[in-house]
């Protein structure tokens, strides 16, 4: 998935109110960018970090920049826009690029199911059981090479696990897919110390048949590409 508009570099001044970030452009101007990430963004919102923004000229949007990436001092990137994983995965699923799902002929996004929820992707094929895929963006890393989820308590994520488990018990295929939006991680673990309830609910869901799939990404200022399956 390529970014529709070329990204521009900037320096983060501060993130606040979760969805706002003040940044300094290379020409010295200070602007406010939209931060499409409701999480804590632990380790990703320190003043002085190099970030990449996507400009827009949409008259309906008050903020003319969207925060897309963090560039670390080691040259690696982290994607901070939580809408990117679904867009990148939709393209990969439709192109049958993910082996675990390649046999499914139809991909539907945001389908109603469960308790007033929407599943990220419903995969169907006449010869296969329905496959419900819930996607989580993974950006936390507290140890070199190890990506973790979640970065804050997520009651919503716990609810999604219960709903996936119900689909598995009903005879459908149910997959919890963690997309690692970091290029410096090759392993994954649940951050049970941050949200023990989520970790416990995952074990319950897994015992009921919910699969866990962790996929890496290749990230540059040009775009995000779905990568390899990572150990977890």
Swiss-Prot record:
Belongs to the SfsA family. InterPro entries: SfsA (IPR005224), SfsA_C (IPR040452), SfsA_N (IPR041465). This is Sugar fermentation stimulation protein homolog. One of its GO terms (molecular function) is DNA binding. HAMAP family: SfsA (MF_00095).
């Amino acid at each position: 998935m390529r970014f529709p508009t070329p990204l521009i570099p900037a320096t983060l001044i501060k993130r606040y109110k979760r969805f706002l970030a003040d940044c300094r452009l290379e020409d010295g101007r200070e602007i406010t960018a939209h931060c499409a990430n409701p999480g804590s963004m632990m380790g990703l919102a320190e003043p002085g970090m190099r970030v990449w923004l996507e400009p827009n000229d949409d008259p309906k949007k008050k903020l003319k920049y969207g925060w897309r990436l963090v560039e670390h001092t080691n040259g690696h990137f982290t994607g901070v826009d939580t809408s990117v994983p679904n867009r990148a995965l939709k393209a990969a699923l439709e192109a049958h690029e993910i082996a675990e799902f390649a046999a499914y002929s139809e991909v539907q996004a945001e389908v109603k199911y469960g308790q007033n929820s929407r599943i990220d992707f419903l995969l169907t094929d006449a010869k296969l059981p329905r496959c419900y895929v819930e996607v989580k963006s993974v950006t936390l890393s507290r140890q070199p090479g190890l990506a973790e989820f979640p970065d804050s308590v997520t009651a919503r994520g716990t609810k999604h696990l219960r709903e996936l488990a119900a689909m598995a018990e009903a005879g459908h295929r149910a997959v919890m897919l963690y997309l690692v939006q970091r290029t410096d991680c090759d392993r994954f673990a649940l951050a049970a110390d941050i949200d023990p309830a989520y970790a416990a609910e995952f074990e319950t869901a897994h015992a009921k048949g919910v699969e866990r799939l962790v996929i890496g990404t290749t990230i540059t200022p040009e775009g995000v590409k779905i990568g390899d399956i990572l150990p977890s």
